[in-house]
């Protein structure tokens, strides 16, 4: 169940970035064929394999031109948040379907859909480059402060690998995922 849930989550995540960017005035994702729900436009199979093996991976990132976005700074933050928000909403929908269906049938797929999409949501909200959370932080902090954290762009992947290997990333994502599942249980 993990692989189909992951492909769906990555596809919706990147589509949401592309859709938000185009709606905010940047034609780049449309010109690159990224405003589609076709997984082949968004999936990087090495990134999917890493996610299955390590608990984190990547899809093909959507390229944007921030200068084309309405409300340039805030537009960039909205585009960055569109992906994690779509994963959170998809996780909620999957949880609701899992809760409504009898054990067996498709319930396992929807349970994995909820957990995988929560992982994608919370992983991408971390303020470490190249993740979406860093794009939001970059917009929010003053330029002089940004220079103090710019070095992160060079070492972001290394930081994520180390956090994953020592188990910190798994604990943080697991705690966030558990809290969201409890929230869904109260709602549904």
Segments from the language model and where they lie:
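Hydrophobic transmembrane alpha-helices and their immediate loop junctions
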Residues: 1-188
């Amino acid at each position: 169940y993990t692989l189909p849930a992951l492909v769906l989550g990555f596809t919706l995540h990147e589509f949401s970035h592309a859709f938000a960017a185009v709606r905010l005035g940047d034609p780049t994702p449309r010109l690159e064929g990224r405003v589609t729900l076709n997984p082949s436009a968004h999936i990087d199979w090495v990134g999917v394999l890493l996610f299955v093996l390590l608990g984190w991976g990547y899809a093909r990132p959507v390229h944007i031109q921030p200068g084309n976005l309405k409300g340039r700074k805030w537009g960039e933050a909205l585009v960055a948040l569109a992906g994690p928000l779509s994963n959170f909403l998809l996780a909620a929908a999957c949880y609701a379907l899992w809760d409504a269906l009898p054990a067996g049938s498709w319930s396992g797929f929807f349970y994995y859909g909820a957990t995988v999409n929560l992982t994608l949501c919370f992983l991408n909200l971390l303020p470490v480059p190249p993740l979406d959370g860093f794009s939001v932080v970059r917009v929010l902090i003053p330029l002089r402060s940004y220079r103090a954290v710019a070095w992160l762009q060079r070492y972001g992947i290394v930081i994520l690998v180390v956090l994953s290997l020592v188990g910190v990333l798994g604990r943080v994502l697991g705690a966030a995922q558990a809290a969201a599942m409890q929230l869904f249980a109260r709602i549904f």
